[in-house]
Amino acid sequence: MTINLSDVYQGYIDCLNSQDWGNLGDYVGAEVSYNGKRIGLDAYRQAREKEFRDPDLHFEVRILVSDQKTVASRLEFDISPSGEFLGLPVNGKRVKFSENVFYEYEGGKIVRVWSVLDKATIAAQIARSWCEAPANKRRTR
């Protein structure tokens, strides 16, 4: 029987969006690798939990392509992180950005993830909002 990875992946996204951490192992392998480094399920879960400290985080699938062992997805985000985000001083500003991510599956579970976040778009939005702010409201470093 062939597994439909598009359906499995949507289940994974639903698991993330509902923050159902106890069931993350149903979708992610115990020895998962992230961007070429083996981190394991516990570290992967902790990273996702940390991302959800931003209360308006929601994974929105815009593009999804799959075959028998690979999923490619473009995710979109519209969030207002406090403080720094990806090393950038977002400080509560609303930012919209994308992530292009590839997943390799074995036995119906994610075993390898390659992720590229559009950090340049976030930086441009921060710079634009800083330039548009009145001089007396600008935060300096």
Model region roles, listed by residue range:
Residues 1-141:
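C-terminal and inter-domain tail/linker signature
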